[in-house]
């Protein structure tokens, strides 16, 4: 049985700001190192070792509490639960932890972000993760202090490539996300590196917006053919107009066309459940099922002013009813049902500081609506009365 979370024993994550963290859900302030340090020194540094020992003794690192443990208490499925299930076969590695918390194995699973280049301006995102936000970020109050330039600390880092060469025998999994990975030079450079180094047995997983399958002179399909295991998790937050509203520059027809082109690689589409997406998530699941594609619901953990628990009780009741109909009409496997039920359970909870968070949500959303010439109440007429009273 895994104590705490398996990631500190197998995983190294380098984020968009050049910070190393336990995983992509951890705030930047809780990094375990930076790009200025040799990457080879991170996996067994003092912070990593302390976290391992804390987990082995039954403790919960403060940085993990909100992002995973609090979600679990409310019935949601956390990243910790997901990775423990996926990588449970590596649980034995915990038994070989030294007294000081260090381990002898190299990372098995890498998540290195090759920059914040992206063509979408999602409302639950920002300039820290999307270059498309740069132009307008100063017009949105919460983004004024964020960096507004392309950041890529790894594509041209000799330190990273030397380290990868050193640990290549250990690396079994690589996760690509963004920004938008299919628009990143580092992504294609890494694919070619794996090919040149006879490492095509590595399992590649993507979170992609599927807005384009062409970049410069690269042919991603020809590259993918050389790998044994490709798994795509295309991101789609809500159904049609709701997704297009919350993910500026998203086009449903393009998404579905490209989804069908890459269908053989698709593990599941991924929907982040939030104020913006939850109302039409049942329709999304049903439509994807008609295409013989599964949908995974990932509970949003930040920013908390987009949390779906902020939705009014009558809308929560309406969403519950829609899901009940869905569960009766659409054939779903046990994993899909569990995923849906956990999100419903999370939705039905109350949230602390509700009024404060709602005011933050409306203030932000009004600014983006003004910028995009869009209307929340026209897109979500069921929420119009509630929205106007915030």
Question: Could you describe each region identified by the protein language model?
Answer:
Residues 1-151, 167-169, 335-390:
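N-terminal pre-core extensions flanking Radical SAM catalytic domains
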Residues 17, 205, 227-236, 252-389:
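Conserved C-terminal portion of the radical SAM core fold
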Residues 143-158, 169-174, 190-191, 196, ...:
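Eukaryote-biased activation of long, low-complexity terminal tails and linkers
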Residues 40, 65, 122, 165, ...:
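Non-transmembrane alpha-helical segments in soluble domains
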Residues 162-167, 191-197, 221-225:
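Leucine-rich repeat
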Residues 110, 160-163, 167, 190, ...:
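Alpha-helical packing segments of well-folded alpha/beta enzyme cores
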Residues 188-192, 215-223, 280-284:
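Distinct, well-ordered alpha-helical segments
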Residues 107-117, 128-156, 169-185, 197-216, ...:
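Core AdoMet radical
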């Amino acid at each position: 049985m895994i104590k705490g979370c398996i990631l500190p024993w197998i995983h190294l994550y380098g984020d968009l700001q050049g910070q190393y963290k336990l995983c992509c859900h951890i705030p930047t302030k809780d990094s375990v190192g930076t790009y200025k340090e040799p990457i080879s020194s991170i996996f067994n540094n003092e912070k990593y070792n302390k976290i391992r020992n804390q987990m082995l003794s039954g403790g919960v690192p403060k940085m993990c509490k909100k992002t995973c443990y609090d979600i679990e208490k409310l019935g949601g499925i956390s990243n910790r639960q997901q990775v423990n299930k996926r990588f449970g076969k590596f649980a034995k590695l915990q038994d070989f932890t030294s007294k000081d918390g260090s381990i002898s194995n190299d990372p098995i699973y890498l998540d290195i972000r090759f920059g914040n280049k992206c063509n979408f301006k999602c409302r639950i995102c920002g300039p820290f993760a999307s270059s498309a936000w740069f132009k307008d970020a100063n017009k949105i109050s919460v983004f004024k202090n964020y960096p507004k330039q392309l950041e890529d600390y790894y594509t041209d880092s000799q330190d990273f490539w030397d380290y990868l060469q050193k640990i290549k025998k250990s690396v079994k999994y690589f996760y690509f996300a963004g920004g938008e990975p299919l628009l990143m030079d580092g992504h294609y450079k890494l694919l070619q590196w794996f090919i040149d180094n006879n490492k095509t047995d590595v399992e590649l997983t993507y979170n992609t917006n599927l807005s384009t399958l062409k970049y410069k002179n690269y042919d991603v399909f020809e590259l993918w053919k050389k790998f044994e295991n490709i798994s795509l998790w295309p991101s789609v937050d809500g159904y049609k107009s709701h997704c297009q509203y919350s993910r500026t520059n998203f086009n449903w027809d393009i998404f579905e066309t490209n989804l069908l082109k890459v269908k053989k690689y698709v593990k599941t589409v991924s929907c982040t459940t939030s104020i913006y997406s939850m109302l039409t998530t049942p329709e999304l699941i049903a439509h994807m099922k008609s295409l013989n594609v599964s949908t995974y619901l990932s509970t949003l953990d930040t920013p908390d002013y987009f949390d779906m628990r902020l939705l009014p009780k009558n809308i929560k009741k309406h969403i519950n009813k829609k899901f009940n109909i869905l569960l009766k009409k659409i054939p779903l496997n046990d994993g899909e049902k569990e995923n849906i039920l956990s999100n419903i359970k999370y939705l039905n909870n109350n949230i602390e500081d509700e009024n404060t968070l709602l005011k933050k949500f409306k203030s932000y959303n009004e600014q983006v609506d003004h910028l995009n010439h869009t209307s929340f109440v026209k897109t979500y007429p069921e929420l119009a009365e509630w929205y106007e009273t915030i």
